[in-house]
Regions:
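Surface cap/lid and interfacial helix-loop subdomains adjacent to catalytic sites
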Residues: 129-146, 168-329, 333-337
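Gly/Ala-rich beta-loop-alpha elbow adjacent to hydrolase catalytic centers
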Residues: 154-158, 162
Length: 337
């Protein structure tokens, strides 16, 4: 028990350092910069990293910019913000880069302060962020893809941006035929979204392709959050047993929770940390075997028991394995054509 308590303290201390990096960004006053030119290498956190891989991943970073009175979107020239952006990308890069050549654009993401606004008032700043993401994606598609299999991936605001790309750019066969899968983790997608965009398909197992993988982790007691407001049902798949119903996965099915630092190095790995099951009412991913006190929300946007910060970390090895499984399924299917 003492050993586990020490691990938890180390993990939480590391995460506290990460979130403290946001503090100076929150108060820095700067006007939002102009649109980036994605033909310039400086506007990419990663551009074609891992040339020997069989596929590409286009990864969209989560929110790291706090926001300021004069700048609700991250200024591209803000070097502290770029350093945090790169660090947050590194924390999730290892899930994908064993299988994929890695692309990750810097973009004028909406600051955390935007999420304090009512939902209908957030859109101008999120729309600006999406302008950059789409421009970067189109540059990649037109200049670098060359028919290669594609994994689309993001977390939190990055997942929101992934879903916007899926709605906007994957309704034609040429683009959708490239898609191995879209890992849009840490944001909601609903039945209404699927009705409005019938070309979208949710994953139904561990190896289907051209699909969306999504979930939002929380304690069993949570009934409302920024990510899944009360009365909303999100669509999800369990990242341990790859079921979409409420069938629980035990902690023994979890090959490893991993907690990387800003370099991407895994500081702590805990096999069998927790199981998970999908709440049939909320569509959230309930995480029963950890304590909210040991894994605090980290941001005032989230109440106790919202495990948003840990969506990738709790299920790191399972997600890493699944990227390879889906890519192999895609390659087999396309080799047979």
């Amino acid at each position: 028990m003492k050993q586990h308590a020490g691990i938890r303290r180390a993990v939480c201390a590391g995460l506290a350092v990460i979130w403290l990096l946001l503090v100076p960004l929150w108060t820095a006053g700067a006007e939002t910069s102009g649109a980036p030119d994605y033909a310039q290498a400086e506007n990419w956190a990663y551009f074609s990293d891992g040339e020997d891989r069989a596929a590409d991943v286009f990864f969209i970073c989560p929110t790291v910019y706090g926001g300021a009175d004069q700048a609700f979107n991250m200024p591209m020239e803000d070097q502290k913000a770029r350093a945090s952006f790169l660090g947050a990308t590194n924390m999730e890069k290892g899930i994908y880069d064993e299988s994929c050549r890695f692309y990750a654009p810097y973009y004028r993401q909406a600051g955390l302060s935007v999420y304090d606004l009512p939902e209908e008032e957030r859109e101008p700043w999120l729309a600006l962020a999406y302008e950059d993401v789409k421009a970067a994606f189109m540059y990649y598609l037109e200049n670098r893809n060359d028919g290669r299999p594609l994994v689309l991936a993001g977390f939190s605001q990055g997942a929101d941006m992934c879903l916007r790309l899926m709605k906007d750019c994957f309704d034609d066969e040429a683009t959708s035929g490239l898609l191995v899968a879209c890992y849009a983790i840490g944001w909601r997608i609903t039945e209404e979204d699927l009705r409005q965009y019938p070309h979208l398909r949710m994953a139904s197992g561990e190896d289907d392709t051209g699909v969306i993988i999504s979930f939002n982790s929380e304690a069993e007691s949570v009934q409302d959050s920024l990510l899944i407001p009360a009365g909303t049902r999100s669509l999800a798949i369990n990242p341990l047993n790859w079921r979409t119903d409420a069938t629980p996965a035990s902690r023994q099915e979890n090959p490893g929770a991993c907690f990387p630092d800003y370099s991407g190095e895994i500081v702590t790995e805990i096999p069998h940390l927790t199981g998970a099951y999908i709440d049939p009412v909320r569509g959230s991913l309930k995480v029963p075997d950890v304590s909210p006190a040991d894994y605090p929300p980290g941001l005032s946007l989230f109440s106790e028991g919202v495990y948003h910060l840990y969506d990738y970390q709790f299920f790191y090895r399972s997600l890493q394995e699944n990227v390879a499984v889906r890519l192999n399924a895609y390659l087999r299917a396309h080799a047979a054509r």
